[in-house]
Amino acid sequence: MEKASGRKSLALSTAENGIENAGLELTEEGINSEQTRRMEVQGHSLSDDVRPATHQRSYLQPLTKARTFCQRHASLFKKILLGLLCLAYAAYFLAACILDFQRALALFVITCLVILVLLLHFLKKFLGKKLTRCLKPFKNSQLRLWIKRVFAGVSLVGLILWLALDTAQRPEQLISFAGICMFVLILFACSKHHSAVSWRTVFWGLGLQFVFGLLVIRTDPGFIAFQWLGDQVQIFLAYTVAGSSFVLGDTLVNDVFAFQSLPIIIFFGCVMSILYYLGLVQWVVQKIAWFLQVTMRTTATETLAVAGNIFVGMTEAPLLIRPYLADLTLSEIHAVMTSGFATISGTVLGAFISFGIDASSLISASVMGAPCALALSKLVYPEEEESKFKSKEGVKLPRGKESNVLEAASNGATDAIALVANVAANLVAFLAVLAFINAALSWLGELVDIQGLTFQVICSYILRPMVYMMGVEWTDCPMVAEMVGIKFFTNEFVAYQQLSQYKKKRLSGMEEWIDGQKQWISVRAEVITTFSLCGFANLSSIGITLGGLTSMVPHRKSDLSKVVIRALFTGSCVSFISACVAGILYVPRGAETDCVSFLSTSFTNRSYETYVCCRELFQNTYLNGTNPPSFSGAWEDKAFSAMALANCCGFYNNTVCA
């Protein structure tokens, strides 16, 4: 009884005082002294352990409350931080523009683009449903039909009037227009199903190409914008020298082609991989694809692949729609292949720019080729099957699989090595084969007393009429025809390298004709040639395309083989029609050189301006036997005309220099 009472007293005492009571006293007589000492020791031990924990909780209590407050108002803090960052950027942006607007032009353009994208996003988010309700009356089928007819009629009349007024000043542009008609008729004659051609798709594609070319080539704002964009791309690609010079040395980078141009492919591949990881490439591709799909009424998959070919190569673009390749119709496969042959990739674009090819023309040709490729592919191989991808919802593009930006950059650079090796190997092989073919043809020609027979000469004769229909002057046609033939039978790298050599000769002030041989082509011919060569349509690309697509869908190898030749031919014609559009729209740009002022000063180096001005002076100079020569036009009564003539005769040979 006493023991039970003692246990009860112990339990009550412990419960009432708690384990934090360090002076716990056990008064029950039933508990011996040893148990008492053990309990005292335990009580002191527990008290020593618990007191610091209690103080720690009291110290952490304000931090806990602060963390809870931050979590509760996280969205508010994010908005405040974002607002402060925007204010700081606005201050920096205004300061940069006020100090030197020309220097801050790139920042201004980027800022405007970001603001435009954000405005479109918020308009769609907050006003999208209202705009849809406002446009609901236009869903009436009869109203839409009348709108289409009026739009088509106005467009046709406007085109006819514009051509009539514009070609009155430059009749040679009509040749390029006739070239477009010629290529369209040839492609229609080669069509797989003539009765199934959707002319709406064809005319929309050609119309979009023409409108974009009009904005970029003819209008001053568009031309200046793309010229500026091309300059920025060149400046950006110049940073490749920092890496390649460190690894390879300045001497190799400056003097050797392989170390000068090929590292740009690695740098550009790295940048494209980063942009793909961030989702920027997918976003731009989807917007372009949506626009083409809505206007041209093509399916989601083929349109997405066509839009992707503006930025990536003919083997990378099908990866965007890889899960859907197995279900594509033959017409859709043909469209995917055609777009690959008709455009170039972003990485190769950088290499061509490093050759000295005009960057704005290359960018314009790539973008203009997308709607034209889609249109002509539907002309040559119209749709007769039922596609599974007619929905306007489109196809979702995945983000990059890399875990961070550094991995994306590393993978992009590593993947570009294979492309660099492929380009270098092809250049070595094709140039060697071309040299052998030329030697063999020259030997065969000499057997029958035909001197100088080469592959380029044969191409210059066979392709000369076609090149003339693009709008190239007849005197430039042999050289342009050579490059077109080289591009188709070898590859575009060799052709663009040849074009860059002609351009360098012109800019260096070399005489146009030497011993009856033309040394360079006109600026107009350079632009048309740049457009006509912009694409992967060559014989070697057949194997690359078939190999890439067959690895993705092996069971459709026979279908791929059926349409690849048609796609190659169609892709070539896309580039030729783009060249015709450039021939229609091209006008000389830049202020003409004031030759009187230019030659009034002493000059020691030859340039294109030197050649043009000296040629003008030669044309206005007349020999008077033993008397000093006389001058006409702007050179008449100029005291320095004789000195300028002497300077020009020091650089160029002419009959008036005798």
Swiss-Prot record:
Extracellular side: 100-104, 163-173, 218-256, 314-332, 382-418, 475-529, 588-658
Topological type in the membrane: Multi-pass membrane protein
GO molecular function annotation: purine nucleoside transmembrane transporter activity; pyrimidine- and adenosine-specific:sodium symporter activity
Glycosylated residues (UniProt): 653
Presence of keyword Transmembrane: yes
Catalysed conversion reaction: uridine(out) + Na(+)(out) = uridine(in) + Na(+)(in); thymidine(out) + Na(+)(out) = thymidine(in) + Na(+)(in); cytidine(out) + Na(+)(out) = cytidine(in) + Na(+)(in); adenosine(out) + Na(+)(out) = adenosine(in) + Na(+)(in)
Keyword Transmembrane: yes
Pfam families the UniProt entry points to: Gate, Nucleos_tra2_C, Nucleos_tra2_N
UniProt subcellular location: Cell membrane; Apical cell membrane
UniProt topological domain (Cytoplasmic) ranges: 1-75, 124-142, 191-196, 279-289, 356-361, 442-452, 554-564
A biological process from GO: retina homeostasis
GO cellular component: apical plasma membrane; plasma membrane
Keywords associated with the record: Cell membrane, Glycoprotein, Membrane, Symport, Transmembrane, Transmembrane helix, Transport
InterPro entries per the UniProt record, alphabetical: C_nuclsd_transpt, C_nuclsd_transpt_met_bac, CNT_C_dom, CNT_N_dom, Gate_dom
Transmembrane region(s): 76-99, 105-123, 143-162, 174-190, 197-217, 257-278, 290-313, 333-355, 362-381, 419-441, 453-474, 530-553, 565-587
S-S bonds: none
Activity modulation comment: Due to its high apparent affinity but slow transport, adenosine could act as a negative regulator of pyrimidine transport under some conditions.
Post-translational modification: N-glycosylated. N-glycosylation is required for localization to the plasma membrane and the transporter activity.
Cited function: Sodium and pyrimidine nucleoside symporter of the plasma membrane that imports uridine, thymidine and cytidine into cells by coupling their transport to the transmembrane sodium electrochemical gradient. Also transports adenosine, an atypical substrate transported with high apparent affinity, but low maximum velocity. Therefore, exhibits the transport characteristics of the nucleoside transport system cit or N2 subtype (N2/cit). Involved in renal nucleoside (re)absorption.
Sequence similarity: Belongs to the concentrative nucleoside transporter (CNT) (TC 2.A.41) family.
Protein name: Sodium/nucleoside cotransporter 1
Protein encoded by which gene: SLC28A1
